[in-house]
Amino acid sequence: KNLIFLGSSCIYPRISRMPIKEKYLLTGELEKTNEPYAIAKIAGIKMCESYNFQYKTNFKCLMPCNIYGPNDNYDLETSHFFPALIKKIHNAKKKKKKFIEIWGNGKAKRELTYVDDLADACEFFLSKKTKEVLINIGSGYELKIIDYCKFIMKKMKCSLAIKKNSKMPNGTPRKLLDCKIAKSYGWRHRYTLEKGFNFTYRDFLRRNIK
């Protein structure tokens, strides 16, 4: 039996050596802001490991970094940072505002992977026999939150001041994944940040997100 369970880069220890290897799971304290989510995901991973041991199944746990792309969630109360930035900057430009606000100091670094790359990884590894249960899936490319702001502004052809809300958390400082295991089986990501953003923003405009 084959199964893909999706973990996440945010269930690794809050402070970890970079890039993050699969073996670092459960070697340090979790990020408090998403601890319940992390515990639930880790429980699923342990179930997969136990099934493989007891029933000789072929269950794998892919560990993606931040995923973005068409049909993303742009609700500012519940969305991840990248779609939130897209919406904030788009709306600020449209309403001729002079600034946007971000959480924390903007120095936390994040790695992004386009949604089609994750879908490709799921299909690639579903029936493939691997000795590893955990397999990181990422692009190998990270930027500071504040630099993602500048990238989006450049793509939208606008310039806005960035107001940092120090009352809000920064989150985990870095979450860059080591994807050597995935690459050893022949998987590679295909979408650059620029290409992925173009598809994502086109979808955002098509859906007329308010």
Task: Name each model feature, range by range.
Residues N34-Y37, C65-H80, G104-D116, S139-Y141:
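Glycine-rich "substrate-gating" loop/helix at the edge of Rossmann-like oxidoreductase active sites
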Residues I15-M18, D72-E77, Y148-C149, R174-K175:
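Short aromatic-enriched loop/helix-cap "lid" or pocket-rim segments at secondary-structure transitions
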Residues P19-K23, T78-H80, A119, M153:
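Glycine-rich, phosphate-binding/catalytic loops in enzymes
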Residues K1-N73, F199-R202, K210:
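N-terminal Rossmann-like NAD(P)+-binding domain of SDR-like oxidoreductases, especially those catalyzing
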Residues N91-K210:
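C-terminal substrate-binding subdomain of Rossmann-fold SDR/epimerase-dehydratase oxidoreductases
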Residues E49-Q54, I86-H90, S127:
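Alpha-helical segments that scaffold the active site and NAD(P)H-binding pocket
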Residues I42-E49, F82-K87, A119-D120, I146:
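Conserved active-site helix of classical SDR/Rossmann-fold NAD(P)-dependent CH-OH oxidoreductases
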